[in-house]
């Protein structure tokens, strides 16, 4: 197996290029790749309006939104409630004029909450803010689906911006600080989101988004033309618990860790999950279809767990030819005391369905 070093592609597998891109910036995850990666692959692989692209771990919706820019049909699966919500909110066909009226209505609303906020949430906000958030959420939930999703995402973003919450791995800590007035922040975010919809030119195609395990996808055999995805990284399970505040703000029900791919800390269990996923991916792809899988070595307290050889073996046994393995990033794996254990690689695997 040949591994080619391509550090020039390193930023493409991070969310950094999309931090200023309209709509993409509404919500990003630490391990998200960029729209630049998806758009580049769509062009290189000649994907068009008659193509179907699948992202079995759709995350923050980057693949789906990039395909919408190109007018390409796409399907996204995930089991994380927040990922499903965000992916759908980013890719709907919105009536911007209608949204403007709804935004005005919500910004002027004075509503009492129908329920009290859970006790655990109050430590993360200035006094009184959770009740104000719940009151507005009640008003938003009366709206039609598209308007409701747009405004709920804006509400959650504003609430987090005005909170005392600070994410430290999988732990949500409290850092009390002075925050700007909530209504002022909410107004700025919602107006910015409206402007994003005007700025990002997309086609009216809407992706299909479903809650579905990537090892059991709901697609006919041989139906997809390409896959662009990034499974959860080995040992990187923080995303399972790190967003519980956002889930509460959006009214979502958290899933148990056992429901997630790679949720077990055992490397062999992770590679077993990967084998199941690769077999399912091979089943739904057309012969000759190309796939891009972004994955990384795992960091444990014992050192670096290399994945490239195992991924190569799994791909070959599942019906793929490995066309390229690109090492695009390397980061030090360290102990909590910052002792260096080795360098962990981040890779782009290009596979072809045999």
PLM feature segments, named:
Residues 1-48:
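S-adenosyl-L-methionine
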Residues 25-29, 116-128, 263-272, 294-309:
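Acceptor-substrate binding/catalytic loop of class I
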Residues 38, 51-67, 74-80, 87, ...:
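Conserved proline-anchored active-site loop of SAM-dependent methyltransferases
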Residues 81-143, 251-260:
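Conserved phosphoryl-transfer catalytic core
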Residues 130-229, 234-241:
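SAM-dependent nucleic-acid methyltransferase catalytic core
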Residues 141-145, 160, 275, 279, ...:
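A SAM-dependent methyltransferase catalytic signature shared across enzymes that methylate proteins
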Residues 226, 232-285, 289:
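SAM-dependent methyltransferase catalytic-core segment centered on the flexible catalytic loop
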Residues 299, 304-305, 312-314, 320-354:
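Class I S-adenosyl-L-methionine
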């Amino acid at each position: 197996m040949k591994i080619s070093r391509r550090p020039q592609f390193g930023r493409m597998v991070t969310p950094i290029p999309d931090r200023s891109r309209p709509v993409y910036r509404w919500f990003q995850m630490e391990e998200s790749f960029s729209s630049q990666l998806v758009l580049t692959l769509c062009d290189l692989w000649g994907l068009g309006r008659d193509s179907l692209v699948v992202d079995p771990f759709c995350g923050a919706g980057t693949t789906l939104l990039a395909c919408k820019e190109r007018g390409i049909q796409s399907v996204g699966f995930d089991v994380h409630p927040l990922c499903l919500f965000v992916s759908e909110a980013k890719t709907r066909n919105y009536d911007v004029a209608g949204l403007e009226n709804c935004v005005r209505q919500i910004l002027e609303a004075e509503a009492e909450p129908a329920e009290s906020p859970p006790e655990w949430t109050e430590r993360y906000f200035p006094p009184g803010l959770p009740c104000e958030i719940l009151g507005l959420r009640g008003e938003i939930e009366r709206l039609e689906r598209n308007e409701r999703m747009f405004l709920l995402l804006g509400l959650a973003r504003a609430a987090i911006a005005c909170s005392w919450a600070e994410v430290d791995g999988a732990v949500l800590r409290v850092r009390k600080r002075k925050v700007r007035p909530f209504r002022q922040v909410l107004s700025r975010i919602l107006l910015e989101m409206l402007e994003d919809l005007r700025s990002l030119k997309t086609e009216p195609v809407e992706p299909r988004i479903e809650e579905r395990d990537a090892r059991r996808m709901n697609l006919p055999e041989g139906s997809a033309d390409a896959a662009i995805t990034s499974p959860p990284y080995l040992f990187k399970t923080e995303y399972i618990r790190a967003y519980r505040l956002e889930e509460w703000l959006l009214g979502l029900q958290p899933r148990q860790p056992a429901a997630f791919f790679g949720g077990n800390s055992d490397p062999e269990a992770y590679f077993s999950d990967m084998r199941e996923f690769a077999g399912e991916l091979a089943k739904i792809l057309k012969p000759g279809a190309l796939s891009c899988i972004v994955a990384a070595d795992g960091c444990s307290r014992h050192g670096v767990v290399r994945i490239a050889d195992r991924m190569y073996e799994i791909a070959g046994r599942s019906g793929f030819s490995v066309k390229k393995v690109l090492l695009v990033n390397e980061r030090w794996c360290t102990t909590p005391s910052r002792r260096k254990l080795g360098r962990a690689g981040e890779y782009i695997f290009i596979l072809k369905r045999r």
